């Protein structure tokens, strides 16, 4: 799975618990979008989370 180019955010793993407290594995995936941003003055297509886009840490080209 891809990870956020700016923050390094990636899939995390844990357990979900039923009412009887039985455990099963599950994962939480970040909302990643492939966008073009400027990296070292050149446009590059990278994976960026929507939270990073909304916060203004990167700007699209």
UniProtKB/Swiss-Prot annotation:
Residues 9-27 have a biased composition (Polar residues). Signal peptide: none annotated. One of its GO terms (cellular component) is ribosome. One of its GO terms (molecular function) is structural constituent of ribosome. Pfam families: Ribosomal_L28. Residues 1-27 are annotated as: Disordered. Keywords: Ribonucleoprotein, Ribosomal protein. GO terms for biological process: translation. InterPro entries: Bacterial_rp_bL28, Ribosomal_bL28, Ribosomal_bL28/bL31-like_sf, Ribosomal_bL28_bact-type, Ribosomal_bL28_sf. HAMAP family: Ribosomal_bL28. NCBIfam families: L28. Belongs to the bacterial ribosomal protein bL28 family. This is Large ribosomal subunit protein bL28. It comes from Lactobacillus delbrueckii subsp. bulgaricus (strain ATCC 11842 / DSM 20081 / BCRC 10696 / JCM 1002 / NBRC 13953 / NCIMB 11778 / NCTC 12712 / WDCM 00102 / Lb 14). The gene is rpmB.
């Amino acid at each position: 799975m891809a990870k956020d180019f700016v923050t390094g955010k990636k899939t995390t793993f844990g357990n979900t618990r039923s009412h009887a407290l039985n455990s099963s594995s599950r994962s939480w995936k970040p909302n990643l979008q492939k966008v073009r941003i400027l990296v070292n003055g050149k446009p590059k297509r990278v994976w960026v989370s929507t939270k990073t886009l909304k916060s203004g840490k990167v700007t699209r080209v």
